[in-house]
Every structure is written in C-alpha cells, then in structure tokens.
Amino acid sequence: MEMEFPKIVAILGLGVSGCAIAEALLRRGVKVVGADEKVSLDELERREYVERLLGQGLELILGKNAFARLIGLQPKLAILSPGISVHREDIKALARSGAKIVGEVEFSYRLLAEELGRDKVCLIAVTGTKGKTTTVHLIARMLEASGLRTILAGNVGVPLAKFVDEFPRDKESPPVRVVMEVSSFQLATCETFRPDIAAVTTLFVDHLDWHSSVEDYRLSKAKIFANQRGDDWAVLNADNAGVRWMAQFVRGKILWCGKEVASSCPYCTHWVSDDGEIVWASLGGDKFPVARLSEFILRGEHNRQNLRVAIGTALLAGARPDVIADVIRNFKGVPNRLELVGEVNGIKFINDSAATTPDAAAAGIRSFDAPIVLIAGGRDKGGNWNGFEKALRERVKALVAMGEFADRLVAMSMKVGVKVTKASSMDEAVKRAVEFAEPGDIVLLSPGCASQDMFRNYEHRGEEFRKAVRELSSEN
C-alpha cells in the first residue's frame, strides 16, 4: 500500500537523513522544499547529495531564517532532522501555521509500516544517554554472524527511509532485522514508532540545550516503549538507576541485564548477567554461558554494561550463543569511543570524542589505571558535573581545557588541585598535553561537552585529534 502525502512537504535540515527522506518523497512525485540554516550550498555537509536532489526537483531555502520562511509556503507536513529542537520559536510558529511537525524516524517508520508491512521487519531500537553506537554495532554483528539478514539503520548505517526504498517487495523475501540507534531528539517526535525490541543502555541528564527540562528529556527517552505490545520486548540495563526508572513505562516483557541481576532478581525469567568471568544468560529456562569477559577488548564497566545489553538483545532477535562469543572475541570497538590512536615516546593517545556529557567523560577517565592527562571542554549541554569533578580529582594528573567551557574547567581543576592550562585548537591541546605527560601516561580526549563551538561534530573533533597525534608521531 502506498502512503499518501500532502501537496507540499518541508524537510527541515539537509543532513544524511533529511536528504534520504527528500529523495524518497521526490521518487513518489511529492513537491519537496528543503530548508537548512547554512547560508550557502557550499556550506552544506551533503552538498553533492543536495545538488543531485535539486536536479530531481528539490526546492531549496537556505539561511538563518530558513525555517520561518517556510510559513509562507504553507506546508501541511514538516519533517524535522534530529538536531533541530521542537521547542524553538520558529518551529512552534511553523506548527501554528498548520504544518504537522514529524521527526525523521517517525516519518520513516510510517513509510516502512504502510509500504512494506511490519511483518517483513524485526525492528530493534537502541537508545540511552551513552553506549548506543557501540551496542548497535555489537548487536548487528552478532545477528549477521548468525546468518540472519540484518541492516544497521538510523543514526549509524543506512537512513531508514533509504532502506524502505531498497527493500525487495516480493512476498518471498525473508524478514530482516533492522537495528537502529535512536536519540531522545528522534523519540520526542514519535507517535506510532514501535520497535519489536527496545533496548536502553543508560539514562543520565543530557541535551538540556535541546529539551525544555530534565523531565522532558527523560520522558522522551521513555517514548521508545509507548507503542509496544504485550509480546514485544524491553532490554534494560539494571545497573543504571535511570534505566531502572524507565521500567515503569514498559508495556511488554523485560529482559534485565546487570552485573548481579541473576542473584538479585530471582523472579526474573529472562536476563543476562556475569560472575566477573563468564557472561551467563537465561531465556526463560536454565541459565547458559555465553562468553568470557576477558575476551572483550573494550575497557571500562560502562562497556561491559553495553555488552550485556547487546547480548540480551541479540539473543532475543535470534543470534546463536556460540556465534555471539566469537563476535565478542573479534570486536575492536567503534571510532571515537576509547579508541587507541597512537603511542609516542611511551605515551598512549586515546580518542573518546564521543563522550559529549560529563558522565560519559567520567566513565572514560575511570576506564584506565595509568596516570591521565585529560583534554576536555567544548559547548556545555547543561549536564551535572559533580561526577566528572570527582573523577578529575581522583584520576587526572593534568587537564588541557578547550572551547566555551574552558574557563569553568580551569576553575574546577584549580578547586580540586589538578594542573591545568588552556588551548585554542586541537593541535595546541595535544602539544600542551604532552608537556604534562611522561612515559606510561595516557593522553585522553574525553571532552564532556558538545563539539560545535570549534568543530563540525564530534567525529570531526576526533579526526583532528588523530591528525595532531600523527603529526606529533612524525616529529619524533
């Protein structure tokens, strides 16, 4: 069944997902107006993609007031990219003008449900303040290695709208497992989105620069369960207080994952736990071993929590335990997440650029026993810095502060007695860090902040760190 569309559809934000949705709509003969706050075509990250869409009939509005200018066109549907807050005044004005504001995940899900049919897809959605990307990569590899047709979609992998267009329409096509990473931004605008399996890694405070309040952020995350049915699953990290709070919103069945959940939750029938050496699981019967923790290369308790959630989710989706163990042995991690990028003169350089919250940075700091010279800072997102300050006091020998939050970090470092300096570029930050470091130390980029004050995104920040380390290595 083909989905029906209004005469004009607006796309707000022309990133990867925005362009994919625009292309899907243009294929269906819809008039599409793309709006982006970049002031020129050359500034768009997906410039070549947008140019191709212009050739297919896309109309384009650029500039700082691009979204407000859409009002004059009176679109009845506006599809929002994840980074654009529904609480902005120009978005509220667009809604008051008669436009239905829908997020890109919600729109793509409707496209999937109406044109493909839900029986063709086992939809696995993973959310959480941190840990999503590592977890979805683990799940996808476990399913693929088990011989199950699997697509990695959403924030990482293929945009969901693009997957819908490329999926075979014949009835004989086997069901596919779609593994998606979904953010609070995307969930906030969901109305019908229903994953068969909804997994949650962690819940801390984050994105208060986008959400109207802490409560708004938490409730947006909980919307991942809103449309689930009694036979759907939630996979929850029992070792995180925020995730335990989310359990009250679950409508289906729960598989708990935790360090001691097997002993602390005797009434639980489905769980993943470990005894410090072996990861065990139960799917309603006797427990069985899955993997050895010593064979999992990623550091830190937070990554072990991600692993347990990934195992539970993959088992529910049909992965084989012996294959899961093999994937764990060979998994090397994901870029920008405690990634070893080099060693110079006995000093290891670790890229944790994806740590964009204070809690994530604190977890990164606590992943190492060696002395740490920390590079941190950027644009604060309104998080709680108490845990970071404690980790700074206990585990960091010196700090190089960057970006808009640098002065706050300097004051924090002086308060806890940690050596500190400031840097105005990543190249300078790495050089300053080396001045503090000695052989055996770790230089850790774990910013605790967003990147957009100095970089395009956290990936760009991580690449600049790699580049600075490469240049340092070539000089020695």
What are these regions, as identified by a protein language model?
Residues 31-39, 234-238, 375-376, 395-404:
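Short internal beta-strands
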Residues 31-36, 151-152, 179, 256, ...:
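Short beta-strand "acidic-cap" motif of Rossmann-like dinucleotide-binding folds
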Residues 2-12, 16-125, 146, 329, ...:
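Short, basic phosphate-binding NTP loop
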Residues 25, 78, 101, 126, ...:
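Residue-level signal for inorganic ion chemistry
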Residues 2-8, 20-28, 291-396, 411:
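Nucleotide phosphate-binding/pyrophosphate-handling subdomain across enzymes
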Residues 47-56, 386-441, 476:
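C-terminal helical cap/extension that packs against the catalytic core
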Residues 36, 61-64, 102-109, 153, ...:
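Beta-strand->loop->alpha-helix junctions that form or flank phosphate-binding loops
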Residues 8, 24-27, 68-73, 82-238, ...:
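Phosphate-binding loop of NTP-binding sites
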